[in-house]
Amino acid sequence: MITVFVQEHPVRLKSWHDLSFIDGFGRVFQVFDHLISGNLGFGVENDKGRFFIKYAGAPTINYLGSGEDAIERLHRAVQTYQVLAHPAVPALLGVEEMPQGLACVFPWVEGYPLGPLPEHFFAMRQLSMVDRLS
């Protein structure tokens, strides 16, 4: 595991990945680097407001697949976001192809990420393979 910095925020990765593109979105105020989806999340702020950037392509620490797999999954998710357009779901505001990944832009919503908590994921990874599969 290595730590790279996005602005002043540490981002834990399996190996180095260029994240300098995020500067173009604004000032980073939050980083989500512990997700099991293969994505990184960034809370950014600029003169237009606050936004959530979902990025696939970096070697995230809790994802067992490749960056290419994560990019493909996010491409498929973009299609779902477009079909799922509903007032209760944060709107997909934009999609940007990056040299090494894919970034999706959403409005920032106060809260916390849904899904498995990192401590549960860590505890499961400590189990033997037999116990994990049972």
Name each region found by the language model.
Residues 1-29:
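Juxta-kinase regulatory segment immediately upstream of eukaryotic protein kinase catalytic domains
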Residues 30-36:
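Protein kinase glycine-rich loop
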Residues 37-79:
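ATP-binding glycine-rich loop module of kinase domains
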Residues 77-87:
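Structural motif at the C-terminus of the N-lobe alphaC helix and the adjacent alphaC-beta4 loop
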Residues 91-102:
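Short beta-strand micro-motifs within the conserved protein kinase catalytic domain, predominantly
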Residues 100-113:
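Conserved short submotifs of the Hanks-type protein kinase catalytic core
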Residues 114-127:
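AlphaC helix of the protein kinase catalytic domain
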Residues 129-134:
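Conserved alphaE helix
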